Amino acid sequence: MLDPYVKVWLQFGEKRIEKRKTPIFNCTLNPVFNESFSFNVPWEKIRECSLDVMVMDFDNIGRNELIGRILLAEACN
């Protein structure tokens, strides 16, 4: 059974600036993440930033496992 959560990083280029996370949904395969996050970004820097959104599986013993990921940016290469 999975213990999923979502982690969102605000990035400028390759540099991670700020992180937000959802609560962990214990023992579920069909979580519903109804969350909103806000980041303070100066308007003149908005085109330089991106959001790295990762769905993770929490693990008490070992390393948390990446389930899925998307990078939201003006231009992704």
Model-assigned labels for residue ranges:
Residues 5, 18-29, 33-40, 51-77:
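C2 and C2-like phospholipid-binding beta-sandwich domains
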